[in-house]
C-alpha cells in the first residue's frame, strides 16, 4: 500500500490528536477551540474558493480541493466520525443511481 493510500488515516490520527492535546501553535487546535461555527465557516470559505478556482488551471483546483477536504476532515474529527465511515457510505452507494439513492433518504 502506498503512502497516498493511507493519507486519510494518517491525517485523521493527527487531527484527533490535535483535538485531544490542544497546542497553541496548531491551526487545527485553534479551530477546535473556536468550535463548530468556525469550522463550518472555514468549510464554506474553502467551498467558495474551490468554486472560484474551477475556472482556473488544474493546480489551483487541486490546491483548493485539498483545502476543502482538509477542513471537512477537521469537521469529521471534531464530531468523532472516522473517515472510513465516509468511505463505507460511498461504497454503499456505488452502482446505485443518484436519483434512486436520494429518494431513499
Residue locations for each model-derived region?
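Flexible "arm" and connector segments at domain edges
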Residues: 1-65, 69-105
